Amino acid sequence: MSSLRLLADDLTGALDTSAELVGKFGPLEVCWSIASIAPAQPSFSIDSGTRERAADDAFAIVQKLAPRLAGATTAYKKIDSLLRGHWAAELDACWQTGLWDVCILAPAFAYQGRRTLDGQQYARGADGRWSAVGKNLVEQLHDRKLDARRARPADGLRPGINVFDGEADNDLDWAVKAGENYSGRVLWCGSGGLASALARGADVWVSDKLKSPVLGVFGSDNRATALQLDACGDVVIPSGDVAGDIDRIKQALDKGVAFVRLEAPDAHSRDDVARHFAREISRLSRLIDPPGSLVVAGGETVKAQMIAVEARALRPLGRLEPGIPKSVIEGGNWSGVEVVSKSGAFGATNVWAKLLKQNGLL
C-alpha cells in the first residue's frame, strides 16, 4: 500500500499540500508535535514550525525530523512557492541524512501564479507582472555546497538535487513521470503544485458549505489578508482585546458569522505580536462555544488556535480550491469542528467574501 510522509515549515503549508494528496494516499493527519505521531503510522504530515526561526535553528530542527520521512513510498519536503522561510537550509538538512538517492525540486505552482524558468522562481503580482523571487535555485543550493543541477527531459534524473522548471501543470507532470520511473529512493520537494501533479486525476474537491456559526480568526499581517478582510465588510471585528470585545463577537456569532481580525498595537517585534495573538486566541477559545466552522489564515495563527483548544491533529478532507483546504479537528475541546484555512499571502481579494456569500452570510 502506498504511503506519504510530508514535512512542511508551517501549518497552512502542511494542510494545503496534504489536501492535494488525500485522494491518492487516503486519510492522513497533519500534526505539529512529533509526539502525536504513532511510530507505526504509515502516512502523516508534520509542521516543523520553522518558517519564522533563524536558519541555523531551522536546519537543526529539520535534521531531527527528516528521518521520520523514511519508510514511506513518497517522502515529501514541502517548501513555500514564494520561497519564504529557509527552504535551502531545510532541504540541506534532509539531504544530509543520506536517506535518498535523488531529489526532485519543483516549486512552481501555476494556479497561484508561481513559475520556475531556468532555475529562477517567479511570482505574478496583482497587476499581472512577473517578478523574480530570490536568487536562482541552483545557485542557492550551490551556496550550501549541495550537488544540484537543472533537470532536462532528455537527461533523466541524476544523483543529487534535480531542479525542474515549470510554467504550466504539464511541466510538473513530466517531473512526476521522471520520479516514478526512477528505481532509487526519491525525495520530492515542492509546493502544492508538485503535490497536485503527484495526485493528478484524484478527486480532492470538497463542498464549500460552512456549518453555522462561522468563526474567523486572522492574525496574518500580509497585505493580501488585509484586502481580503476589507472585502468582507461588517462581519469583520478588529480586536486587540478579545475579552473587551467578547459581547460584540458573541452577538455576531449568534447572527451566523464573526471574523475576528487580531491586532497588537503595543507590540514592538514579530515575537511580541505572536505572543499577543496566542494569548488572545486562547482567551477567545475559552470565552465562546465551539463554532460550527472555523476560517483562518496564516500558519502561526492556525497553530495557535489548535494549541488553544488542545487539538491533537488536523485531518484534511480535501480542498475548496488549490491552496484552500478543508480539515477536521482531531481531539481536544473543539474536536469535530471543520476548518477552512489558507496561507496569509494567498488568494484573490474576494476569496472570503465569495465564500460567505455562497453560504448566505454576506
Predicted feature residues:
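Active-site histidine-anchored catalytic micro-motif
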Residues: 77-135, 290-291, 296-299, 303-349
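Short glycine/serine/threonine-rich phosphate/pyrophosphate-binding segments
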Residues: 14-16, 86-87, 197, 225, ...
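Cap/lid and interdomain-hinge subdomains that line or gate substrate/regulatory clefts
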Residues: 1-5, 28-35, 42, 53-59, ...
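Short hydrophobic/aromatic-enriched beta-strand-loop microsegments
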Residues: 27-30, 188, 236-239, 312-321
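A structural-propensity feature for long, helix-poor, extended segments
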Residues: 39-49, 328-362
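Residues that scaffold, gate, or flank divalent-cation-dependent active/transport sites
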Residues: 18-26, 34-35
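Short beta-strand segments
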Residues: 7, 45-47, 77-78, 104-108, ...
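Redox- and metal-dependent alpha/beta enzyme cores, enriched for Fe-S-associated oxidoreductases
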Residues: 206-284
